[in-house]
């Protein structure tokens, strides 16, 4: 027996559904509590809960975690402009430490001696769950049936069918999909060929560019200390703001990402992401920082952002390093307040305006027209001192 009572991170998909009978029949677990987190994935979570019970769970719980997800994870990463390998807004990676936190709290509440997840041995999520759970409760046992059972996807589906679990995917195109409020990721099937163009059927949040409006859509995003608080002048809570921005950007074909990325486990993986709100928010936030942060801070922050994104992707959300980086990021956001105007059109998002009460932009210094207050005479002395090391080096070389 691996454990008596287990809390399982449950999604309603093939792997987590099969985990329920597998834990009971193969590993002798006496009680399985299926826990589904509502992260804005748009599913009928009551149906997911009922499916868990039908699959053999002794108890099935749905927890609304949308507010926590947006404010504690998504917006924290936004302040860091966190994009993995410069492109991916980390929608899935950000959800895992939150789910781990919910799992641990539930396990402690119901007296479980272990938690479980349905991650395979190839993916990043196994690392994110195991490391996060270990950081939150080092004594809690973590079970990963899909990492050990050695079944192919077809065999996993067949195993589930033995226990009355229907397969929710077509065997001819078995896409693996993860979806939450911040975005959607798709892999498997024809997408495993990096040369193959993704069929339109893999997309759900964004329109094909050919079907988008001919006229651009303009939006205004207001930020306070790096956190979005209003869209087009309307103050909105984080969940509603992200949802509405997903709709507006998605209708204009914004947010599609097709990339071959480097997984933590050492392999390359072709991933299709849809992150309409995530892409636009990072773009707008970067534009606001360009207006309000000094040059040296902006330059240094880029390195912090890359490290931050790697930490999140690699499952180190609860690491001391991320906590230390948060201190720096929090300082940079003290004056990251203002409004950014973005044009959405035919698959592109373009910043076309920005303003802030803390703007470091001085039009009288920047203008080439009448009213120029820049001291042009000072430039000669500045250039002499600035270029002095280069001239000395050139003299020595001679």
UniProtKB/Swiss-Prot annotation:
BP GO terms, sorted: argininosuccinate metabolic process; L-arginine biosynthetic process; urea cycle
Binding positions (L-citrulline): 88, 124, 128, 176, 185, 261, 273
Gene3D superfamilies: Argininosuccinate synthetase, chain A, domain 2, HUPs, Single helix bin
PANTHER family assigned: ARGININOSUCCINATE SYNTHASE
Listed GO MF terms: argininosuccinate synthase activity; ATP binding
GO CC, any one term: cytoplasm
Subunit field text: Homotetramer.
Pfam families reported for this sequence: Arginosuc_syn_C (PF20979), Arginosuc_synth (PF00764)
Provenance organism: Gloeobacter violaceus (strain ATCC 29082 / PCC 7421)
Catalysed reaction, written as an equation: L-citrulline + L-aspartate + ATP = 2-(N(omega)-L-arginino)succinate + AMP + diphosphate + H(+)
UniProt pathway annotation: Amino-acid biosynthesis; L-arginine biosynthesis; L-arginine from L-ornithine and carbamoyl phosphate: step 2/3
Disulfide bond keyword on record: no
Protein's name in the database: Argininosuccinate synthase
């Amino acid at each position: 027996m691996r454990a008596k009572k287990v809390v399982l991170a449950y999604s309603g998909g093939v792997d987590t559904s099969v985990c329920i009978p597998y834990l009971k029949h193969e590993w002798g677990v006496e009680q399985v509590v299926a826990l589904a987190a509502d992260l804005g994935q748009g599913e009928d979570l009551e149906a997911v809960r009922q499916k868990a019970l039908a699959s053999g769970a002794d108890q099935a719980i749905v927890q609304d975690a949308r507010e926590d997800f947006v404010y504690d994870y998504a917006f924290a990463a936004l302040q860091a402009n966190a994009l993995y390998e410069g492109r991916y807004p980390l929608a899935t990676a950000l959800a895992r430490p939150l789910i781990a936190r919910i799992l641990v709290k539930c396990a402690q509440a119901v007296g479980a001696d272990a938690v479980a997840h349905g991650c395979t041995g190839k993916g990043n999520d196994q690392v994110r769950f195991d490391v996060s759970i270990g950081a939150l409760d080092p004594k809690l046992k973590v079970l990963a049936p899909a990492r050990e059972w050695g079944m192919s996807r077809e065999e996993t589906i067949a195993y589930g069918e033995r226990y009355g679990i229907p397969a929710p995917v077509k065997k001819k195109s078995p896409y693996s999909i993860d979806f939450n409020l911040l975005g959607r990721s798709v892999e498997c099937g024809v997408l495993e060929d990096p040369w193959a163009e993704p069929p339109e059927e893999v997309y759900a949040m964004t329109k094909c560019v050919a079907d988008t409006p001919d006229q651009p859509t303009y939006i205004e995003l207001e930020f306070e200390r790096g956190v979005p608080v209003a869209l087009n002048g309307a103050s909105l809570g984080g969940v509603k703001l992200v949802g509405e921005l997903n709709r507006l950007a998605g209708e204009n074909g914004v947010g599609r990402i097709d990339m071959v990325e480097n997984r933590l486990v050492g392999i390359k993986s072709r991933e299709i992401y849809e992150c309409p709100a995530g892409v636009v928010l990072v773009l707008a936030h970067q534009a606001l920082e360009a207006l309000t942060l000094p040059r040296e801070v902006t330059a240094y922050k880029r390195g912090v952002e890359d490290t931050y994104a790697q930490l999140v992707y690699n499952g180190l959300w609860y690491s001391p390093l991320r906590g230390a980086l948060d201190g720096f990021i929090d300082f940079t956001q003290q004056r990251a307040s203002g409004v950014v105007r973005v044009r959405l059109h035919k698959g592109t998002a373009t910043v076309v305006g920005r303003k802030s009460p803390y703007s470091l932009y001085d039009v009288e210094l920047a203008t080439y027209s009448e009213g120029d207050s820049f001291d042009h005479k000072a430039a000669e002395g500045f250039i002499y001192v600035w270029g002095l090391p280069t001239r000395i080096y050139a003299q020595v070389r001679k």
